[in-house]
Amino acid sequence: MQTYPMPTQAVILAGGLGTRLRSVVRDVPKPMAAIGERPFLSYLLDECVRYGIRDAILAVGYLHETIQQYFGDAYKGMRLRYAIEDEPLGTGGAVKQALRYCPPDMPAFVLNGDTLFATDWQQLYQCYIQQGADIAISLRTMHHFDRYGVVETDSTGRVTAFCEKQYREIGNINGGIYVLSPLLLCNYPDRFSLEQDVLSVSIQHYRLYTHVSESYFIDIGIPDDYRRAQTELPQLFE
């Protein structure tokens, strides 16, 4: 199978307030929640390094100084830059602002800052190229769940529907890693939701394709999973 050079830019949405985590994590942005002796965000940056990212742009807002002071302008040889939200821009607005640091004609990876999905970025990017996708979306197969909505696709992997949360025996959820071009968001307003204003309403307008995996996935957005991350992440990724 032909392979293509990987993007070297990634955006991480690191501006989360961590509202649901306040019972166990206080006074830091959600991606800075401690996992053992280091912040959750460092695990995401390790994934970036592993896949050859040379330039990571952190979309930050709430207590952004905490992140900047901890990580500075580099991480394991990878340049770090910060796209600071002075007011909440939504996930789409935050991504759009951060992508201004990237070459407009080069695709970039985009990651949620409160989930870690150990899917294969190379395969996700191959999907983006080979399908001529506007956006490639990582999907995680889940079993017996009601916490997430599901993404339905056709036999080629193209998205046909985003479905609301309800109990399901099995389904594919959005894993929170994307490939897209900065040009895609140029005409959107400064404040919008990537999920609600782009993905959910653009199935007919954009070519949304998917790569499905059952690789390790964790969402630290609720206390129970955050506690689980304390043991699982050091065991799996140290």
Would you name each region that the model predicts?
Residues Q131-T141:
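A short, conserved acidic/glycine-rich loop-to-beta-strand motif
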